[in-house]
């Protein structure tokens, strides 16, 4: 098992996964990957069309995320990982992964999503929040409120 950390920064769209994950990776001295870049083209097209992904859509993507983590000596990945079963799937490939859940109010998530350009439209936020299962006490990781400066949030993780 590697001593360099493998971390997934998780949360719904707009929670700050990319910004906090990139800052955390720099702080830890490891690489950073945004799992949005690992989505199959069909998933991106589906979301751009305003349709939420289902478990069948997510399965191959989560397998890629897990494999990417498993193959890296240390890595931070920004990945929604909204449901425990998704995190379990990632952990199956990378058992030593730890999760950092970014906690942000639904109102703030909506505001952030409306102020950026992304393939995930704000209309899909409700489906993400309905899918969200907060990190369980028995899961390896921590929940962090994403308020304040990005570097401060990353260091609280």
Locate each region found by the language model.
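P-loop (Walker A) phosphate-binding loop of NTP-binding proteins
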Residues: 12
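Loop/turn-to-beta-strand initiation segments
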Residues: 72-78, 98
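Conserved lysine of the Walker
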Residues: 17
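Hydrophobic anchor at the beta1->P-loop junction of P-loop NTPases
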Residues: 9
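Walker A (P-loop) ATP-phosphate-binding motif of ABC ATPase nucleotide-binding domains
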Residues: 6
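Small-molecule kinase domains that catalyze NTP-dependent phosphoryl transfer to phosphate-bearing small molecules
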Residues: 115-156
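Conserved substrate/cofactor phosphate-moiety recognition/catalytic segment
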Residues: 22-66
């Amino acid at each position: 098992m590697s001593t360099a950390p493998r971390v997934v920064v998780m949360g719904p769209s707009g929670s700050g996964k990319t910004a906090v994950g990139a800052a955390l990776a720099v702080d830890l001295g490891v690489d950073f990957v945004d799992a949005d870049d690992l989505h199959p083209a069909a998933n991106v097209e589906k979301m751009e069309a305003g349709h939420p992904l289902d478990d069948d859509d997510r399965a191959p993507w989560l397998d890629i995320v897990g494999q990417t983590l498993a193959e890296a000596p240390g890595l931070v990945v920004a990945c929604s990982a909204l449901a425990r079963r998704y995190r379990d799937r990632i952990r199956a490939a990378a058992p030593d992964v730890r999760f950092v859940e970014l906690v942000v109010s639904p109102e703030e998530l909506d505001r952030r999503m409306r102020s950026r350009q992304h393939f995930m439209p704000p209309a899909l936020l409700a489906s993400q929040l309905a899918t969200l299962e907060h990190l369980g006490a028995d899961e390896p990781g921590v929940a962090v409120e994403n308020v304040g400066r990005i570097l401060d949030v990353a260091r609280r993780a």
